[in-house]
Amino acid sequence: MTASSRNNFTETINHRQPDRVVVDFGSTGVTGIHIAIVEKLRNYYGLEKRPVKAVEPYQMLGEVESDLIDAMGIDVVGLFGAKNMFGVPAEDWKLHKTIWGQEVLFPGSFNYTYNSNGDILM
């Protein structure tokens, strides 16, 4: 019988051998996944099509929801604050279309413009 994600994580951080390698995608800004890749992974696993939330807009990291966590066998779940790294509340999500055509969600009070290169400016 394999150990739970929690047990394997506990073994890992205590420098003991877990049942298997602990998998972390998307729980931090370091292990995050770009919004375009989150959408492609959702499609690959046949999950519901919906806009990905840009939980970290500087790197354009997407929210890894519980259905994708289950499909990929991810062990670590992120705990995000009420605001993103720019201090913008993570609420009242609004639809945004990226320069590559992907529809994503940004926090409602995340205000931006585009420059002549198509870059997002805050």
Describe each PLM feature range.
Residues 1-122:
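Catalytic cores of TIM-barrel enzymes
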